[in-house]
Amino acid sequence: MITYAKAGVNRKLREKIKMRKFLIEENDIIVTYSDNDIGQAKKYLKVMKIYNSEKNISQMTRNIGVPRRTFYYWIKGTAPKPINCLKWLKHYHLVPFKKFDLNNYCHRILFDIYAFMFGDGSLDKTYIELSGERKNLRAIETKIHKFFPNISTNIFKTAERACSLFIYSAYLARFLIALGCPIGDKQSKEYSIPVWVIKDKRLAKRWLETFLGNEGVKIREKRRIARIEQYKLIDLENNALLFLNQIKQMLKKFNIKNNISSSRVTYTRKKDNKKIKGYYLKISRDKLNIYRLLNTLKYRYAQHKQIENDKTLRYLRKDLISHNNRFKAYNIAQYLKKNNYRKSQVKKIYNTLRLFKKGIPWKTFYSGYFLKSFTPRYYQRRDEIKKFNLKTK
């Protein structure tokens, strides 16, 4: 289902889209233009259809309601904006557009830009803006020029470490609008993630990786805090919660536990004195949950965050390997205890075992044999840890 950012696209049309084979058809691009531009496009198509068979040009232009000057512009090749947009998109096989194929490199970069629009991106009818670090934005710019060589781009420095990439393409902007990207200020707009993203696991993963690169915080070793913050007008609270619940649903596909909360404090925006509120998606700090997050999803286009995340991932992997070794030591000790091995034999068996299986801790081995109530930490979740396929010593 496509959710339109532009008001005026009625519910019946959106219901019809559910049954279609294509995400974007010609009409989806046309309806992103003004009524005047749409009217001109309709007249243009009528003129082009009957021009060659019509002998009386004056009569034809009067009947259709087109000035003679406009008619001659059209004949010479200057078409209305919607028609030019469709020609450009058809040239690059973006209309009709069936789906994003992540095996296609062009589709891949377009989908990343699409995901940016829900995070550190901004969309206007004439340009696209992406925010981030210069190195990451330069990589996107290079790919844009590779697939769309005639598009102009520019990178401006906006803060000490932050830059903005401007992509000056009204046609590509219309393509994103037709896909349902929010236009302008996201705090005061209603929008949601389309069903076709949520249902496709590969698209959901790619979308999350780009969005987390934009909005996620870097996850440090000890605190393991991972969350997403969204600020919205109080009047749009339901939409903010819907959006975060959709992200929650996608994270659930990868067994990543999270919960949603909202701030009790409201803030007043300086530009219009409207009240806004913070909404948060907090990912559980549980060690296994954070490992699963970092092992499954990479933060795209956020190199400084990913470096920190990789450190945390290495730390957690090392820690979980230690837990695995404790489980082994405990299981062996329990086996010896069950089979009535004498205490004098336990130390000898441990020393022999240590030669073949490195990393088996004596403390856990000893406690597993001598202490009745002892169980290693996370032992009840050993099957869950086993699924990570950690390389143990």
Name the predicted role of every residue range.
Residues 1-393:
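Internal intein/HINT superfamily modules and their associated LAGLIDADG
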